[in-house]
Structures are given as C-alpha cells and as structure tokens.
C-alpha cells in the first residue's frame, strides 16, 4: 500500500514523463535507486542521456518546486547517475545532463535543462 505522498509523487513523475515525451525525449527508466539516492526519470534527448529530478509542490506561493533541490540532493543525484553509468557501460561514453521538472498543484510545469552543473 502506498502513502498519499507516494501516490502524489508517482502521479507527478507520470505527468513529467508525458510532458517530456511530448517535447521529444524518449523514456528509458524510472526510479533508479542506489544507496541513498534515487533518480526519478532517465530519458534520452537525441544522443544525450538525461537524468531528471521531478518536484511537486501543492503550495508554491513561497517557494517554487524547482528551488527545493538542495546541494545535498544534487550530490546524491550525481552519485546515483555515476553508478547508473558504471552499471550500463556503453552509456558511459555519451553526453549527460541533469534536468529538473517542477510541477505545481494547478499542473503548471517548469522544465529546467542543465539545472545541475557537473565538473569532471
């Protein structure tokens, strides 16, 4: 049985996935987990691998969902993505980026490409 919060999160991820597919991205997988990290969606944008964090906020008057991705969360996303790339070796040679999709209760979607900068 899933909690209400989990159901809301799943619905937000589904909404984000459909939105991104309409924008031309192709779905690869969802909810990839590694230790303390999870990547909500992994998609491809032509020849680029895209790791996507989905954020939902019921009330966004004070802070937009996108602004809730903390530096700690960013580090966890990067570590999880590196593990994904190691596990899927042919993919470790292609370009990657980290996007954030914010969704509000009124279904407003904000998509920020390259939201997290990674230095190699």
From Swiss-Prot:
CDD domains: PoNe_Nuclease
Protein family (similarity comment): Belongs to the UPF0102 family.
Listed Gene3D superfamilies: 3.40.1350.10
GO-annotated molecular function: nucleic acid binding
Classification via InterPro entries: Restrct_endonuc-II-like (IPR011335), tRNA_endonuc-like_dom_sf (IPR011856), UPF0102_YraN-like (IPR003509)
Stated name of the protein: UPF0102 protein CBU_1742
Superkingdom, natural source: Bacteria
């Amino acid at each position: 049985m899933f909690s209400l919060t989990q159901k809301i999160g799943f619905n937000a991820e589904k909404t984000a996935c459909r939105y991104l597919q309409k924008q031309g991205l192709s779905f690869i997988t969802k909810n990839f987990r590694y230790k303390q990290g999870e990547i909500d969606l992994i998609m491809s944008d032509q020849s680029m691998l895209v790791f996507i964090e989905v954020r939902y906020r019921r009330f966004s008057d004070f802070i937009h969902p996108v602004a809730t991705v903390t530096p700690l969360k960013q580090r966890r996303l990067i570590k999880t993505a590196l593990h994904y790339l190691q596990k899927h070796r042919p993919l470790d040679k292609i370009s990657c980026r980290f996007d954030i999709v914010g969704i509000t209760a009124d279904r407003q979607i904000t998509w920020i490409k390259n939201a997290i900068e990674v230095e190699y």
